């Protein structure tokens, strides 16, 4: 499973990129707004840091407007992927993007049927929202499994991005479910580094070494 970071914060991206684990980045209007910076400039800076798909979301709701809005985004860098909401207009836009050779990420996917429709429209990626499903008492990782099974049965090549990752168990569950990609907030990636036994082990090694060199 590949790892993307879900953020628009340049410093967070730079830090995690140095770990050698990043295959891409996802952003959304909320994350961009949080940074208080020019959208296109942020996307351009991200493409200079990470070599891989960079999802940039359109804010228009009509297919024709989405297609127009995306032109400035795809002009930034070939790795820019247009993020589109899972709606009828979104699917129309995905079809248009696919015909132009522009990659798309269909977001806000909450059912296997939505994932099937998105794939058939030509989506390069679909993003089932694991955490938000858990919030309403459904099992997000089970949706990922269902989508994978459907795609495998029908030979669909659309990649599945497990999104709305809230904690480290979500990341583990996404990997076990077989997601192609998990897009993970900075906080959860940092938490994934940690285990108390690791810290204890390092402390013991250092104490043992200090005792040896005295």
Swiss-Prot record:
What is the role of the protein in this entry?
Transaldolase is important for the balance of metabolites in the pentose-phosphate pathway.
Pathway(s) served: Carbohydrate degradation; pentose phosphate pathway; D-glyceraldehyde 3-phosphate and beta-D-fructose 6-phosphate from D-ribose 5-phosphate and D-xylulose 5-phosphate (non-oxidative stage): step 2/3
> What protein does this entry describe?
Probable transaldolase
UniProt keyword Transferase, yes or no: yes
SUPFAM superfamilies listed in its UniProt record = Aldolase
Name of the top EC class for this enzyme: transferase
Which GO cellular component term is one of those annotated? cytoplasm
Q: Name one GO biological process term.
A: pentose-phosphate shunt
Its EC number is 2.2.1.2
């Amino acid at each position: 499973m590949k790892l993307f970071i879900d953020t628009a914060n340049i410093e967070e991206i730079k830090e995690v990129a140095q770990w050698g684990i990043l295959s891409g980045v996802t952003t959304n209007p909320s994350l961009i707004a949080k940074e208080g910076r020019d959208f296109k400039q942020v996307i351009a800076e991200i493409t200079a840091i990470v070599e891989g798909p960079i999802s940039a979301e359109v804010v228009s709701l009509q297919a024709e407007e989405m297609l127009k809005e995306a032109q400035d985004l795809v002009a930034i860098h070939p790795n820019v992927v247009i993020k589109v909401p899972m709606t009828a207009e979104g699917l129309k836009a995905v079809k248009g993007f696919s015909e132009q050779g522009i990659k798309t990420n269909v977001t806000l996917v909450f059912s296997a049927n939505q994932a099937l429709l998105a794939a058939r429209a030509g989506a390069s990626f679909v993003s089932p929202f694991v955490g938000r499903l858990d919030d309403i008492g459904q099992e997000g990782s089970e949706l990922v499994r269902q989508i994978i099974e459907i795609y495998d049965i029908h030979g669909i090549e659309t990649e599945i991005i497990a999104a709305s990752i809230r904690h480290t168990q979500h990341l583990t569950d996404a990997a076990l479910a077989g997601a192609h990609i998990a897009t993970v907030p900075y906080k959860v990636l940092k938490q994934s580094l940690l285990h108390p036994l690791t810290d204890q082990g390092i402390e013991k090694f250092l104490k043992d070494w200090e005792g040896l060199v005295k």
